[in-house]
């Protein structure tokens, strides 16, 4: 309510991001997304709502365990079943879902996003990818991702049929003003890609 009272009249206030990030059907998340999304829509006259869950795959970083692989990767059939159930329960309250792409292996990303897109069409929810611009394959947490890995993820998302892409996190990992030297090169490669380079 406070955010709406302060900023709701600004033209830049175009919708809501529900910040609860989950990867699976857990913690009464259907009720949380349903109630929060419904509240935000009613408060703002129907402005769109979005969530950005992660794919709980082999690359998922668990700060409470040693190593990157948390040892609890979701299978594709379980992902499909759980997200169908979640989407069925939040239809009309959540308009778009941007799946964080860093949790699963590159070879599995297209399959997970394809399943998500199919479920999204079934339930009337727009599916996007949330491209993580940092590298999970390095012993240091976290450095800007190599361009060829980002391109691989963008192409997998395109093949899966996502509606669009968002990114986490531009200012640290891809900005030409970032303190990470690697971010400057990543930004140049991405600009070249947008201009039609690298044979989209």
Segment roles from a protein language model:
Residues 1-200:
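Glycan-processing catalytic domains of CAZymes
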